């Protein structure tokens, strides 16, 4: 069984509350593989940015829009070092609210940035990212970037454009950045997380779920650029059917009007555990 422990960080203070059986989110999980210790911990920075601490203590960072994020807690917004050492950096596409601080974090940590092939290429050719820190892969490509960690790139229905300030002209330039992706991340104990990235509805969500069998889904609900709450609920209830879901990509842009309350209402009566988070909060599985 999976018991979820939720924490919230504001400034330097951390409030930890243990959710007892009567109120905890509980879901089934595969038996941990031999040698896998500890729990899985997710920290949400806002938008689509998460840090995953794996059962063996590896740190995975996804879509780190930290310094520019309007809802990023100050302890991280004002000091990227507060995120801690990062072992693996994943970016779903080149839009600024996903690529964000990834190149800076990659260089600071000497950690490779894994992302869509045609996003990583302009990052390296333009000098935004050193070539040795870029790793290119594409949809359905599975990689093992760290011992015991598997990452598979999957479909996302969205767009991708790299906006870059040319230091020679001091002007912004737009560069094609390939296709966006989502990620199936399998941890040391077999626990699988599907970070959907930015996406609208597509029927192969059913295939992806049936084939990869994610335990936890991180799903956008804000609308306008991604699924709205009702679309996200339809995808989950009809096609994906995970054990647990964390809504993301809302509450950060006036154009993404979808709300947590609307999503919770659309999920009412479902057996899928909805785990709402606030920016700076962590959950443990």
Swiss-Prot record:
Keywords assigned by UniProt, alphabetized: Hydrolase
InterPro entries named in the record: Metallo-B-lactamas, RibonucZ/Hydroxyglut_hydro, UPF0173, UPF0173_UPF0282_UlaG_hydrolase
GO molecular function: hydrolase activity
Database matches in SUPFAM superfamilies: Metallo-hydrolase/oxidoreductase (SSF56281)
Family recorded in the similarity comment: Belongs to the UPF0173 family.
PANTHER family attached to this UniProt entry: UPF0173 METAL-DEPENDENT HYDROLASE MJ1163, UPF0173 METAL-DEPENDENT HYDROLASE MJ1163-RELATED
NCBIfam families named in the record: PRK00685.1 (NF001911)
HAMAP family per UniProt: UPF0173
Protein name in UniProt: UPF0173 metal-dependent hydrolase Pnuc_1524
Species lineage: Bacteria, Pseudomonadati, Pseudomonadota, Betaproteobacteria, Burkholderiales
């Amino acid at each position: 069984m999976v018991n979820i422990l939720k924490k919230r960080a504001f400034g330097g203070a951390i409030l930890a509350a243990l959710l007892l059986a009567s109120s905890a989110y509980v879901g089934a999980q595969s038996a941990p593989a031999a040698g896998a210790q500890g729990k899985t911990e997710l920290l949400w920075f806002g938008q689509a940015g998460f840090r995953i601490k794996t059962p063996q203590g590896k740190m995975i960072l996804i879509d780190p829009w930290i310094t520019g994020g309007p809802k990023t807690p100050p302890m991280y917004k004002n000091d990227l070092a507060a995120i801690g050492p990062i072992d693996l950096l994943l970016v779903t596409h080149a839009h600024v609210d996903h690529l964000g601080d990834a190149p800076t974090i990659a260089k600071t940590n000497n950690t490779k940035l894994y992302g869509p092939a045609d996003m990583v290429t302009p990052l390296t050719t333009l000098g935004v990212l050193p070539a040795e820190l870029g790793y290119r892969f594409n949809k359905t490509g599975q990689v093992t970037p760290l011992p015991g960690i598997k990452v598979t790139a999957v479909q996302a229905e969205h767009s991708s454009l790299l906006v870059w300030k040319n230091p020679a002209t001091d002007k912004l330039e737009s560069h094609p950045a390939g296709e966006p992706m989502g990620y199936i991340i399998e941890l040391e104990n077999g626990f699988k997380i599907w970070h959907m990235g930015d996406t609208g509805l597509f029927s192969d969500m059913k295939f992806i779920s049936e084939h990869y069998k994610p335990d936890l889904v991180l799903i956008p609900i804000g609308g306008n650029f991604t699924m709205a709450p009702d679309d996200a609920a339809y995808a989950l209830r009809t096609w994906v059917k995970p054990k647990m879901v964390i809504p993301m990509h809302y509450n950060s842009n006036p154009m993404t009007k979808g709300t947590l309350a609307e999503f919770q209402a659309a999920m009412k009566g479902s057996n899928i555990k909805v785990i709402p988070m606030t920016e700076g909060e962590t959950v443990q599985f």
